[in-house]
Amino acid sequence: YISEVGGPRQGNVEGVRKLFNRVVKAAEGAAKGTETKMVFEVMHGNYPLMPNETLSVLIDEELKKLGGISYTDEENLFAQELYKTLLNPDSVIGDQQSVQPLVLTQSKGSTDVGDVSWKVPTSGVRIATWVPGTSAHSWQAVAAGGTTIGTKGSTLAAKVLANSAVKLYFCLLYTSDAADEWL
């Protein structure tokens, strides 16, 4: 008896359905070829995040007001040591100090926030909580995230989202524009 939990990822709902059906057919074929039985159960699924330009621009404006993350001397030493362990980093220490230009893309990652975004206008923010160049799901991400570097990033994210929420509350134009775009 073998159990596997996983799921196909694709940039859109129809793509996930098609890919899922192919995975099922491949598993059925493998079961026939090995004279075994294949059964499956869909336990959950996540829709891709539906981007909302109105909210993304609002959040980006609030992030630009607050700026990036500066390291203390101690944090910089830690970051440099951690940076030495990274494989093919795509950015350098210091990049966390500036806010990157807003690029509107559709995330292909799996998240329950994607499900929410199909019910209400949704957006979020990505903040440097790791040493620049760190790969997600790595020990380096965990190591940096548990330090003041991670705390600074989390705090900045909270401030950006809170300031954005206040702006939404007091300026109904953003709310109506986000809803119009979503519909």
Put a short name on every predicted segment:
Residues Y1-Y71, E81-Y83:
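Midchain, well-structured core segments that form catalytic/ion-binding scaffolds
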Residues P8-R9, C171-L173:
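Short, compositionally biased segments
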Residues T34, Y169-L172:
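Long, hydrophobic, amphipathic alpha-helical segments used as structural scaffolds
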Residues E35-M38, G124, L183:
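Secondary-structure boundary/capping signal
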Residues I59, V116, L161:
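Divalent metal-coordination and catalytic microenvironments
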Residues N76-A158, S176:
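Zn-dependent metallopeptidase/amidohydrolase metal-coordination segment
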Residues A162-K167:
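Short glycine/serine- and small hydrophobic-enriched flexible loop segments
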Residues Y174-L183:
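Single conserved hydrophobic/aromatic residue that forms the stacking wall/gate
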